[in-house]
């Protein structure tokens, strides 16, 4: 991975942590994205007293199909053969569901 890609990923992780915190969700970046510390994920968020390990991916156009399917819906469920289903939703909607908006 090139430096510009790492920088882009780091910026996104910092932005996500700030958004989580704005919704009252305790969150922090995992040092070195967990590579050196043996942790999975890029971010740890505390939700209902439990650690949620969150992986963050940023792509220029890599998720067009997902955005197209999600358009106008609150959430999208995707499933590959012999895999568990995944739910995709706008970040702010997720934060509204699990966080507490600061006033």
Regions found by a protein language model. Give the residues of each.
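Catalytic phosphate/metal-binding cores of nucleic-acid and nucleotide-processing enzymes, i.e., regions
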Residues: 1-103
